[in-house]
Regions:
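C-terminal structural segment of proteins
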Residues: 1-129
Length: 129
């Protein structure tokens, strides 16, 4: 169970970074991975207002925000065309659609879980974080 004392919706990455320096504060995403243990969080840092849920395409690369969901990855036409469906195939069987609608790329990478198909997918693509 997770207990949150205060929720802070930050207005900048700098503010989030500053708050995250204290060990009892945690950045929130979909919160699915935080539920894996008992936690007491002094300040929960909400990044939802920072536009980090975007997938942007340039001529050189794709940029995937840390708040982009696994479902966004699964359905993104440009990413899947480039990778011949690899990203769709890597995430489409992760739990269920409702879970993928909430689970974020950032949480999947940061958690470094041994069962993570997302980590393997980005490793295979030689992605930069």
């Amino acid at each position: 169970m997770i207990k949150i004392r205060e929720l802070v919706k930050v207005e900048s990455l700098e503010e989030a970074w500053e708050l995250n320096q204290k060990r009892t504060n945690k950045i929130l995403g979909g919160m699915l991975w935080l539920r894996l243990g008992n936690r007491n969080v002094q300040k929960a840092i909400d990044l939802s207002g920072l536009g980090l849920d975007q997938i942007e395409e340039t001529e050189e690369a794709f940029s995937i925000g840390c708040m982009a969901t696994l479902r966004q990855i699964e359905l993104h036409e440009g990413l899947n065309a480039l990778c011949e469906g690899l990203l769709h195939d890597a995430v489409c069987d992760i739990v269920g659609t409702q879970f993928r609608n909430l689970a974020t790329v950032g949480g999947s990478i940061f958690g470094r879980f041994g069962f993570s198909d997302v980590l393997t997918m980005f490793l295979a693509l030689d992605a930069s974080v």
